From Swiss-Prot:
Biological classification of the source: Eukaryota, Metazoa, Ecdysozoa, Arthropoda, Hexapoda
Name of this chain's protein: Protein suppressor of forked
Pfam family, one: Suf
Summary of the function given for this chain in its UniProt record: Essential protein, may play a role in mRNA production or stability.
Quaternary assembly: Probably interacts with an RNA-binding protein.
Length: 765
């Protein structure tokens, strides 16, 4: 299947650099939503025949996004290309369960079929089709209501036709009032009124029969509103980006589907529960179609439902077989027929769910995830469980035919399937095919050799496979280590030592790649060899390491490998660092920790690095402490500091002159407050009239006064010798002033409070 870039074929003369650049971006990055939006906005202003290639590319890249299909169809409808509209609906309508797209479909049928003689039949079929597919949507109220209004508006001639009309309306009402949708209360009121108009006596009976199911559906509708709050059903489906918004949407969809799986309607109808869960899953796949977990979970649910129904059918057969044997032979035929009907019903439903599970997995590997091996493997295992081996072979071959994938893991799983289903000979034929594929890596030889050893119990065949792989992957230290592990497992000491010598002396491994093999060789000799062989391997390894720059001068670090065992080391982690052992072999020091043992005492030492880090505060929320000489009490959590001013207030204070620029006159605060205390104010302000000699013209006095400023007394510069010249204050980010520009203002000469304090101080002396 072609990639997303190959699906973009836009042939439009934009005439603007901005649009040309947007097209170049989407050709490079097909899922760039912003660039697509730029072109879509321009395309909506042009005729459809000029921009049809854009819309085709759009729906090919985003095949599950209902919003883009809706834009495309609306453009075709606007130009009255109804044949194209019907083809577009055939391509997308059944696959995309989006309420807005289905409403557009009903609008199209209503507009285009109104002139036909069979208009009413066409509309009724369209409504039935829509409600069958989208009727469980939480926001499908308008479709239910429109269908009811349509049926009630149909003219009925004769009693038979009238009864048919009433039956049809009642049937739709009764389905609607037990379906959890927003606005179900209004439908219930309309239904009760409808039954009252027909027959008040029957109405009460109908309401009593349906009220319990209605209350249950209304409760679920309220809960669904909560569980679906925040879901964006119109997001374009793009590959996972792990953004915060995407993670949130994934969690919301999981919560929605989990809620549906909990059977909120509390029904015993397994088919209804499965339908509702799959409806929610299908809507989720419109947005998260690039997420393989959603596809896999959907298939798992269907598979589980099929198994439950199968077990239910078996359990029913066991429970009903005893009563059949106890009845007379004459009546046993009726019992057997009833039993067969119930058993066949469950089995048939289970088969439908199993086929739907296969359909879900088939859609997943034929869609945008056609290169996802996980879904191929899950599908293959499912079909293997149904004994459809030919289909499994077809799936594996289909995946292997993709040119731009690594087929190694596919061959490994293919061999395992062939061995399980058809025996070891079939697996060997797959291994032969894998060896001939130049894309295959060393893993296929390891998998084939271990399969022969564990399944056919023939270690000689496994030896030959490993030797065959060594000719091809002798320069791969990973493959060599797998071969060594196999020989060690067999306890073949001589063969293992020979393999070490062959690999290390053949020259197939570069010095850098041979480090791991040398370390393993030393470990091997430390476990089973004598001291002379250990020292010999150490010397040979040191000779190789001398040519590597990163191992120069670390002879002591190389000695550690002789005495270590698993995660036990002869030095503490600090000492290992000091001798360069961590840099030598890349050990994880936090694993050493207390496991390191002292050479002298042998006791476990406590490593300071193993101590968990202390929690640190959020420094962005801390208040800067800036002491001021005359800080008001309570202005800061700590004495002597002040809160930073808001940005607007700080900007205003920066434009005001400094306090020492004001030289008087100064108001006597005590006299001013004494006047306020003795002042008797009326309850209400006097109204100006001729009797109290108050006139509105008095308040116009300020307008007639010309204020004269003596520029000789104040020019913006202090003339007093004792006054401290003002300094400009620099506004810092955050609305505070610079600390180095703080200054202490000179007290005014007419400060009454200061004079009184001086007099009291003189008297006390």
């Amino acid at each position: 299947m072609s990639s997303a870039r190959d699906l973009i074929k836009v042939d439009i003369e934009w005439g603007m650099e901005r649009l040309v650049r947007a097209q170049q971006v989407v050709e490079l990055r097909p899922y760039d939503i912003e660039s697509w939006s730029v072109m879509i906005r321009e395309a909506q202003t042009r005729p459809i025949h000029e921009v049809r290639s854009l819309y085709e590319s759009l729906v090919n890249v985003f095949p599950t996004t209902a919003r883009y299909w809706k834009l495309y169809i609306e453009m075709e409808m606007r130009s009255r290309y109804y044949e194209r509209v019907e083809k577009l609906f055939q391509r997308c309508l059944v696959k995309i369960l989006n309420i807005d797209l289905w409403k557009l479909y009903l609008t199209y049928v209503k507009e285009t079929k109104s002139g036909l003689s069979t208009h009413k039949e066409k509309m009724a079929q369209a409504y039935d089709f829509a409600l069958e597919k989208i009727g469980m949507d939480l926001h499908s109220f308008s479709i239910w209501q429109d269908y009811i209004y349509f049926l009630r508006g149909v003219e009925a001639v004769g009693n038979y036709a009238e009864n048919q009309k009433i039956t049809a309306v009642r049937r739709v009402y009764q389905k609607a009032v037990v379906t959890p949708i927003v606005g179900i209360e209004q439908l219930w009121k309309d239904y009760i009124a409808f039954e009252q108009n027909i027959n008040p006596i029957i109405s009460e009976k109908m309401s009593l029969e349906r009220s319990k199911d209605y209350m249950n559906a209304r409760r679920v509708a309220k809960e669904l509103e909560y569980h679906t709050k925040g879901l964006n059903r119109n997001l374009p489906a793009v590959p996972p980006t792990l953004t915060k918004e995407e993670v949130k949407q994934v969690e919301l969809w999981k919560r929605f589907i989990t809620y549906e799986k909990s059977n909120p309607l509390r029904t015993e109808d397994t088919a209804l529960v499965t339908r509702r869960v799959m409806f929610a899953t299908e809507q989720c796949l419109l947005v998260l179609t690039h997420h393989p977990a959603v596809w896999h979970q959907a298939s798992q649910f269907l598979d589980t439902s099929a198994r439950v129904l199968t077990e239910k059918g078996v359990r029913t057969s066991v429970e009903n077989i005893s009563p059949i044997l106890c009845v007379p032979v004459v009546n046993q035929i009726e019992w057997v027929m009833a039993f067969a009907w119930w058993w066949a019903k469950d089995v048939q439903a289970a088969k439908i769910f199993a086929d739907e599970c296969a359909n879900i997995l088939e859609r997943s590997i034929n869609g945008v995830l056609n290169r996802n091996a996980l879904l191929y493997f899950a599908y293959a295992d499912f079909e293997e469980g149904r004994l459809k081996y030919e289909k499994v072979h077809t799936m594996y071959n289909k995946l292997l035919q993709l040119p731009d994938i690594d087929p190694t893991l596919v061959y490994v799983q293919y061999m395992k399937f062939a061995r399980r289903a058809e025996g070891i000979k079939s697996a060997r034929s797959i291994f032969k095919k894998a060896r001939e594929d130049v894309r295959s890596r060393y893993h296929i030889f390891v998998a084939a050799a271990l399969m022969e050893y564990y399944c056919s119990k023939d270690k000689e065949i496994a030896f030959r496979i490993f030797e065959l792989g060594l000719k091809r992957f002798g320069g791969s230290p990973e493959y060599v280590m797998c071969y060594i592990d196999y020989l060690s497992h067999l306890n073949e000491d001589n063969n293992t030592r020979v393999l070490f010598e062959r690999v290390l002396s053949s020259g197939g491994l570069s010095p850098h790649k041979s480090v791991e093999v040398w370390n393993r060789f030393l470990e091997f000799e430390s476990n089973i060899g004598d001291l002379s062989s250990i020292v010999k391997v150490e010397r040979r390894r040191s000779a190789v390491f001398e040519n590597l720059k990163e191992y120069e001068g670390k002879e002591t670090a190389q000695l550690v490998d002789r005495y270590k065992f698993l995660d036990l080391y002869p030095c503490t982690s600090t000492e290992l660092k000091s001798i360069g052992y961590a840099e030598n072999v890349g050990i994880i020091l936090n694993k050493v920790g207390g496991g390191a043992q002292s050479q002298n005492t042998g006791e476990v030492e406590t490593d300071s690095e193993a101590t968990p880090p202390l929690p640190r505060p959020d420094f962005s929320q801390m208040i800067p402490f800036k002491p001021r000489p005359c800080a008001h009490p309570g202005a800061h959590p700590l004495a002597g500091g002040v809160f930073p001013q808001p940005p607007a207030l700080a900007a205003l204070c920066a434009t005001l002159p400094p306090p020492n620029s004001f030289r008087g006159p100064f108001v006597s605060v005590e006299l001013l407050f004494d006047i306020f205390m003795r002042l008797n104010l009326p309850d209400s302000a006097p109204q100006p009239n001729g009797d109290n000699e108050l006139s509105p013209k008095i308040f116009d006095l300020a307008k007639s006064v010309h204020w004269i400023v003596d520029t000789s007394t104040y020019t913006g510069v202090q003339h007093s010798v004792t006054a401290v010249p003002p300094r400009r204050r620099r506004l810092l980010p955050g609305g505070d002033d610079s600390d180095d520009e703080l200054q202490t203002a000179v007290p005014p000469s007419h400060d009454i409070y200061r004079l009184r304090q001086l007099k009291r101080f003189a008297k006390s002396n």
